[in-house]
Amino acid sequence: MLDMNRIRKEPREVERLLANKGCIVNFDETLALDAKKRALATEGDALKAKRNQLSAQVPRMKKNGEDTTALFEEVRQIGDQIKALDDEAEAIGKQITDFVAGLPNLPDPDVLPGGKENNKVLHQWGEKPVFDFEPKDHVQLAESLHLVDYPRGAKLGGSGKWVYTGDGARLEWALINYFIDTHLKDGWQFMLVPHILNYEAGYCAGQFPKFEDSVFWVGEREGRRDQIILPTAETALVNLHRGEILSEDELPKKYFAYTPCYRQEAGSYRSEERGMIRGNQFNKVEMV
């Protein structure tokens, strides 16, 4: 998540960098909320100090036989004011956090602004082949070789689904095993993770709240969507040590996992290309 201190100090610069990634924001409202939150905290601290001063008078008053009823009532009222301020500050803090958590990371200064149309070729290797025939894309090849059945996949599960058939299924499985064997030889630890994860897993992976509508939800807790079918094994792997403190001699941790990935993909590319990555379900070996 972006550093709120930097947003306070350089709001226009952070806006400019985000705009380079196509994310247009204005931090004026966020900064106003942040200032209000800090003002509420200052007011609350002053009231807490006053409450402590009043509470410190109680032993002396009781020792002198003085009536403490009015004092206790004043302390109670101050406590109510503090709670109201804390509740308001917490609500504002959540509003700020939810907004900032949905923003992308700032790009490296060397990254060119804009989309893929502004990409700059830095290096090329080899020569681009020239065919004396019209080459087929991977979808056409998969269909002509009967490796993938798109119509029956759509019949079984709707758009964004497909069926690997015959040699296509064997090839898919062979590739998965190839990557598993390769990573094991390189010293990575193989993990099989749950396919159903809680909200915190998506949030701590940096995928929520921005991509909340891109996953499949399967459960609720206290009236809020809570459980998801994992969109990638990364979501689980980066949360394995969530809330833990690892000693230096335990590092590095090198994990990988194979899982199907489930996503509610959307966008123009879905209508332009029937790929085998940007569907609702696809296989992936993920390294973390």
Label each residue range with its predicted role.
Residues Q124-V288:
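TRNA-recognition modules of translation machinery and tRNA-sensing kinases, especially anticodon-binding
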Residues M1-P129, L147:
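N-terminal alpha-helical targeting/anchoring segments
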